[in-house]
Amino acid sequence: KFINLLKRKQITETQRDASIDPFGVNKVGVPSMGGVIIIFAILIPCLLLGKLSNIYMILMLITTIWLGSLGFADDYIKIFKKDKEGLHGKFKIIGQVGLGLIVGLTLYLSPQVVIRENIEIEKPDGQIEVVHAAKEIKATQTTIPFFKSNNFDYADLVGFMGEHAQTAGWILFVIITIFVVTAVSNGANLNDGMDGMAAGNSAIIGLTLGILAYVSSHIEYAGYLNIMYIPGSEELVIFICAFIGALIGFLWYNAYPAQVFMGDTGSLTIGGIIAVYTRNC
């Protein structure tokens, strides 16, 4: 029904990039802006099942709405204003940088965003046991999966600043967050060239990130796998399940031969979601 509505309103593809999709000439007239249904398929389950006071859930919902609106504006200008360039690039960048700044500062300032560090303890027999610290702390650390002694601290990169290294580490964290949000959301936008490409790839990425979020939200699993325990991050699992479900449902109609395209409404949103998700877990 939604696809038929897009057809009736003539919300369709006008031109595809032949360098990305050599079959694009045959897709003129295929409905676009299908990303709208992806956004609603994410938001509705999260609003019904998620804990809306959880800072991680709040950030993911803000990301979905923020970049969804940015992508919608881009598609609207392309389709209804007949301007193939869409929203001017500088406005896209401003929107993405603004979101990255909000996410980075929120993770820095929110008292809900804490971790429990991994601590290595040497046993009497000489073996090393990894345990979690008793107290939760604010830190600029992150875990690099599948590596021994895998805690990476942004503050280490600015250790030359002495007693100000921790604050400088957070500033660096915010800057990198802005870069990641901007780069990944634009990367997903470029990836949306062939039938099913963006939706399929993003669903696989979402599954991987969901597993990492699930493990890091359980203190026993996190300890066993030697990654940081992040209290409250279990809400990210609820969000990513909605994300994957929305993409798989959309993929049914977006796989070759595509009956609908997500447009920038979808591609900017899913790229931003992946970027912000990686900064949360």
Name what the model sees in each region.
Residues 34, 75, 264:
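Divalent metal-coordination and catalytic microenvironments
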Residues 18-27, 82, 158-166, 223-231, ...:
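Short juxtamembrane and helix-loop transition motifs at transmembrane-helix boundaries
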Residues 148-179, 185:
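Individual transmembrane alpha-helix segments
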Residues 53-61, 80-95:
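Membrane-interfacial loop-to-helix junctions in multi-pass inner-membrane proteins
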Residues 1-5, 9-10, 38-69, 101-124, ...:
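Alpha-helical transmembrane segments
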Residues 2-26, 76-85, 135-147:
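Cytosolic, membrane-interface loops and tails of multi-pass inner-membrane proteins
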Residues 125-163:
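Extracytosolic (periplasmic/ER-lumenal) interhelical loops and adjacent juxtamembrane/interface segments
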Residues 27-39, 91-97:
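Select subsegments of transmembrane alpha-helices in polytopic membrane proteins
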